[in-house]
Design a protein with these regions (language model features):
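Juxtamembrane extracytoplasmic/periplasmic/luminal helical "stalk" adjacent to the first N-terminal
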Residues: 7-77, 87-96, 149, 180, ...
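Extracytoplasmic/periplasmic ligand-binding sensor regions of membrane-associated signaling proteins
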Residues: 87-169, 176-178, 247-254
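Short hydrophobic alpha-helical segments used for membrane anchoring or interfacial signaling
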Residues: 58-59, 98-104, 186-193
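Extreme N-terminal signal-anchor transmembrane helix of membrane signaling/transducer proteins, especially
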Residues: 1-25, 297-311
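Intrinsic low-complexity, intrinsically disordered coil/linker regions enriched in small/polar
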Residues: 173-254
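Short, glycine-anchored, charge-dense loop/turn motifs used at functional sites
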Residues: 102-109, 193-195, 268-271
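Conserved beta-strands of PAS-like sensory domains
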Residues: 146-180, 259-261, 266, 271-288
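Membrane-interface helix-start motif
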Residues: 280-303
Length: 314
């Protein structure tokens, strides 16, 4: 019976191995689909938001009262006219940034923060709008560290650039849309070298849920759609020194399991700033996978044992 037992054992091992390989193959395909969905959703949501902001800005650019106030550099009049506009588009369209900028890129008015003005703006989006004389847009970091999807338009009157109009949607709002649409959690970790700590802490002091600078050694988690970072991801961020490109892995903590998809996050200049980390809860699927594996092992063992007994008593 030893040759038969050996053959049965090999058969069981082969059957279980095929099951495991097939399960892992399906899992890899599922992760790849999720990763592709995240990247596609990010592009599509950004494109939709850009089109939305452009449509609103093109209406604002037609307002003769605003044009007159901008030409006169009348900050108070611009604020009076623009505050109701910002309140409306913030409530309806998630637009939180609204700027009037002079032709030399000096900030004339931040409608959302009217006491802060007079600084020179060197953001890439605005520089490109100035250089090309055309609208330009993209995700870009602000002076206080937040990332915003920005759109900048030259304000042209009688062939003359009298200033620039810029609007923006917080990056976190885009992440929230991805979370809601794909049923995932999203974390954005940015290398600390891209931040001014004093400005970061100034901005965080105003937040309902401030992000502590010392939470992790090398990165700050700028955006998070989950109130608590899972322990394995916190350990990952704690050990993170540099970005390593796109990758996927699985984590488990507190009887939960999640697919983890890491996508490099870059700015408009092509600088790799950090990582977009997406978590998809697969706790139920992982439990089904374990039950399936246990079932395959049990069935294979029972069938193999039954055949051995059959041939033994034959």
């Amino acid at each position: 019976l030893l040759p038969l037992a050996a053959a049965m054992l090999l058969l069981v091992i082969a059957f279980v191995s095929i099951f495991v390989i097939e399960t892992r193959h399906r899992q890899a395909e599922d992760i790849a689909r999720t990763a592709a969905s995240v990247e596609t959703m990010f592009r599509e949501q950004s494109a939709e938001d850009i089109q939305l902001v452009r449509s609103i800005m093109e209406l604002v650019l037609q307002d003769q009262h605003l044009e007159t106030a901008l030409r006169a550099r009348d900050r108070q009049r611009l604020l009076e006219l623009s505050t109701p506009i910002l309140n409306d588009i913030r409530a309806r369209n998630r637009i939180t940034h609204f700027y009037y900028i002079l032709p030399d890129r000096t900030m004339l008015l931040r409608v959302q923060a009217p006491t802060k003005h007079g600084d020179r703006i060197d953001r890439f989006v605005l520089q490109e709008a100035q250089r090309t004389g055309k609208p330009f847009w993209g995700n870009e970091q602000g002076p206080l560290g937040s990332f915003t999807l920005r759109v900048a338009y030259p304000w042209i009157s009688n062939g003359e650039v009298i200033g620039y109009l810029e609007m923006g949607i917080e990056f976190e709002d885009i992440m929230q849309s991805i979370k809601n649409f794909l049923d995932v959690q999203v974390l954005v970790a940015i290398n600390k070298s891209f931040f001014d700590r004093a400005k970061w802490e100034e901005a965080q002091a105003k937040n309902v849920r401030p992000v502590p600078w010392d939470e992790f050694p090398a990165v700050v988690v700028l955006s998070r759609t989950t109130p608590e970072i899972p322990a394995p991801i916190a350990a990952y961020f704690g050990a993170l020194k540099e970005q390593h490109g796109k990758r996927t892995f699985e984590i488990d903590w507190e009887q939960r399991v999640a697919q983890t998809i890491v996508v490099p996050f870059a700015n408009l200049r092509g600088q790799e700033l950090g990582e977009l980390v997406v978590l998809r809860d697969i706790t139920l699927r992982a439990a089904e996978r374990r039950r399936g594996l246990i079932g395959v092992v049990l069935v294979s063992t029972i069938v193999g044992g039954g055949l051995m007994l059959f041939f033994h008593f034959l």
